[in-house]
Structures are given as C-alpha cells and as structure tokens.
Amino acid sequence: TSGFTTNIKEITDADPMTGNNEYKNLKEFYVSESGHARLFTATKYGKRFMLKCLKKDFLYIPVYQQALSKEFEIGLQLEHPNICHTIELEQVDGLGTTIVMEYVDGDNLQTLIDRQQITPSLAEKIVCQLMDALEYMHNKQIIHRDLKPSNIMVTHNGQNVKIIDFGLSDSDSFYVLKTPAGTSGYIAPEQLLPGAKSEARADIYSLGCVINDIANVTNSNKLKKMAALCTTRDTNLRPQSINELRSHSFSSSRYIIATIILAIYCLIMAGIIVATYYNRSKQAAEEETGIQTQNGDSNKWNDNKIVDYQQW
C-alpha cells in the first residue's frame, strides 16, 4: 500500500468501467501499438493531468492489472525533479484502473532529435540530468529497463528532462513481468540472453544509445566517446554505475574545471619557483658583493699601512 491508496486490490477488483468522474476534458494522447497501455490528458479542478490505463482488450486480464499496479508502486517511490511524478491510482469512469501522473508540457526527446533541435548546451544539460535521474533510481534499486528518446520528455519551460513510462521498470520488491524488456536499438545485448538479470549496467547501455542519438545531432566528439563507453558489449568494461561514468574525463564539465584548477596551480607553483630562484640569486649576489667590498677595504687598509710604515 501507499500513502495515497489504502487498498490497491480493492481498486483493481472494482468494475473497470466505473469510478471517479471528476476528470474532465478527457483526450486520448497515445495508444501503444504493441503494448497494453493507453494515455489520456484530462483536467480536474482546473489542473491538467496525464492518465495511464489499460487498453480495453486488457482491462479484465489479471496479469496486466498487476503490471499497472506494479508501475504505480514503483513510480510512487520516485520523487526527483527529472522524473515524471506519479500521483495516484484511481478508478476513473470509462477508463478503469488508472495511474494519475503530472502533466509534462513539452516534447519527447525523439521529436527534438528528428527535428535536429538540440544545441550543444542543451545536449550537455539533457545528458547531465539523465545521469542524475538514473543515479537516483539505481540508488533505490530500481532499473528503468526501457530508456529511449520517446520515454524522455524535455519541458518547454526551462528545457528540463522528465523520464516517463515505468511500465517495464524492475525493482527488488516486484516479481511481475521479470522477462527481458526493452526496445530494439536501446536494449543491452546481455538482456536478450537466457536468465538475464536487471542491472544498472543495462540502463547505462541504453543511456549510451540515447547519448549517441544526441551526439549525432550536435556532432559532439565528447558525447560520442561517452556513448561508446556506455555501449561496450563486454559488461565488465562498461561503467558499473553512473558514479563511475562521471569519473571519466568526458562525463561532465567538471573535467574542464579540474583542468583550469590544475593550470592555475601550475602557474602558481611556477611563480613560486621563479620567485625563490630570484631571491636566492639576489641574496647570493649581495653576499658576493659584500665579500668583494670587505676585500677591497682590507686591501686599502694594508696599502695605507705600508705607506705609513715607509713614511715612518
């Protein structure tokens, strides 16, 4: 159970075609061609929401009802600025059991890629925010399993990332739909092998595929190198975590900052060495001058003494 829903089974066992009728302006937003879900936009009390429910052919099939409940429970655990916020699980009139989510006003990343509308600065921002979101999820032992451009929203206001669609996500707490999941072109190759386990490295592979798509738009060598590392087929050579990925020089602007700091440090050290050498040289010169002066005075004294003696 969750803080919002007292009994999920009670909701999923209810008549799928009856329920909350407070949602207005219901509009179909997306219907999965090969999957079991459909999306609607709707308003309630003047606020816009995204509703996710089962297609009519799957409304009464227990395994898909379980899958929807699983997605809700996983989504409810995630509170991060770069992850679409899951709000409630309700019975909505005409839709059945429905996940209520925040409405994201923006475009999915695939649209921006197709339109070539990604600048170098936006590309860096998207990659950094994706890493932040995945690191947060992985720290909670949750794997997305279907990261791809169409599951990543970029808001119109601020151009911030929002990861969506946790229908294939996996957590240690759930055992529904444990079969390999993902999309061709983005799924890690090891996930297609018998007995494959969901691991952070699989998400990192998918992240690399997404980064490569972005790099092809911006022609960024740094992002291409990053994508190549993430998509290494040998899982032992692939970064084991987002934190490890960050440690590589190309992973973020911290490399540039570190380089600048190192350069400043080298300049300071060079200045200290030059100043020390100058001071020592100056001191040695002064000491040598002093010795010469003393010798000169001594010679003068001796000369005077000889003269005086002769006079005497």
Tell me the role of every PLM-derived stretch:
Residues D132-I142:
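Protein kinase catalytic-loop region centered on the HRD/HxD motif
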Residues G94-N108, L112:
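Conserved short submotifs of the Hanks-type protein kinase catalytic core
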Residues K52-D57:
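Conserved beta3-strand ATP-binding lysine motif
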